[in-house]
């Protein structure tokens, strides 16, 4: 920036004569050599000539806007240029704010002023260099400041200036799309006509002005907070709108196919194949209720109403209940009713009867042998199973064992049978009979004696007749 740039000069409200100011110096302190009276006399003489020091220029709030930024930029740029080239500085000229031309992009919507606002330059000095001090405000400025501090005492003298302090009515937002969304081909649009400041102002009393000065800062604060909340809530919507605007018509047409697409439903039919079950669950395992549905879609409640077991031969519920009773020692289970097998039309189901008999035999085999303590001393079963002498076996081959056809009483016949098998008879025949039947049971269960009887055939008797004891 060259030294020929015109710097802002001090403009006095009462005098249009320019006063020189030294660049880079804000003010001149009062000299200690002069007394108070001399300084006051000098100030009075200078005020008579129209020279005022430390003048304060009051601007209305509506004029304190972003429109003053270009003026400040010009002022700051000139200060930097004069500081860099102080030797090239020339006498300053008077510049009016209204005569400054702003750039094309910066409009002047708030430049209407009732009073022309003057920006003062650097503080002036006296030519002789003595009694350097700051300028004092003009009497009119002092009265205006006092009226601001105590508006009741002003008696409406500055009522028009106070009306200038009131904020104009808030203009509604412009209609239509924002400038960012308009096409460049449309050309620049002229801004809508703005109403004059005087038409929007209302004549208010001093009390209303005081209340407005108090309430306006609070309203502005609330307005800013609500604007921030609206901006934060609309961020997501604005992003979505921006994303939609980035697509072309062809891309939007392609994106519509996403919603229009429908998947094809393919029904997969299960293929049933025969297989061998690898794992057979045991009794008492937890049923997972993972069942393959029947082809006829009939719910048979497997696992709920009947036991779910893989083998084809299902267990009998009565036999299972008897096994549980035999294994448990719970008194509550033992006190329940004993299960009874019920078979309808037994004459038509002989296989069910045979199965029941075989199940009962297997159940009794699994039961542990009961231990009986006899009152009298009796021989054990192993001793009674010893082989008989050879002479007795030869006699038995020719002589038949007495049958129940003997003309004797039942007690006598029992004693004869017990003596043949070498079982002593005591006071109680029940213990002796229990030992004799236990001996016969051991013979029937012994595979050795069963094979021996089948080989010898013992006079043509078969195994079926050997299992029966005739009394």
From Swiss-Prot:
Stretches the record annotates as Disordered: 1-202, 226-246
Compositional bias annotation for Acidic residues: 89-99, 231-246
Keyword DNA-binding: no
A Pfam family per the record: IFT46_B_C
Subcellular compartments: Cell projection, Cilium; Cytoplasm, Cytoskeleton, Cilium basal body; Cell projection, Dendrite; Perikaryon
Gene Ontology CC: cilium; cytoplasm; dendrite; intraciliary transport particle B; microtubule organizing center; motile cilium; neuronal cell body; perikaryon
InterPro entries reported in the protein's UniProt record: Intraflagellar_transp_cmplxB
Gene ablation phenotype (knockout): Shorter and compacted dendritic endings of the amphid and phasmid neurons with an abnormal distribution of the intraflagellar transport protein osm-6 along these ciliated endings. Defective chemotaxis with 78% of mutants exhibiting reduced tracking to the chemoattractant ammonium chloride.
Top-level taxon of the source organism: Eukaryota
Expression sites (tissue/organ): Expressed in the hypodermis and sensory neurons including inner labial, PDE, amphid and phasmid neurons.
Keywords for the protein's UniProt record, in alphabetical order: Cell projection, Cilium, Cytoplasm, Cytoskeleton, Transport
Gene Ontology terms describing biological process: cilium assembly; intraciliary transport; non-motile cilium assembly
Protein role: Component of the intraflagellar transport (IFT) complex B required for transport of proteins in the motile cilium. May be required for ciliary entrance and transport of specific ciliary cargo proteins such as che-3 which are related to motility. Required for normal morphology and function of ciliated amphid sensory neurons.
Quaternary structure annotation from Swiss-Prot or TrEMBL: Component of the IFT complex B composed of at least che-2, che-13, dyf-1, dyf-3, dyf-6, dyf-11, dyf-13, ift-20, ift-74, ift-81, ifta-2, osm-1, osm-5 and osm-6.
Family per similarity comment: Belongs to the IFT46 family.
Name of the featured protein: Intraflagellar transport protein 46 homolog
Organism encoding this protein: Caenorhabditis elegans
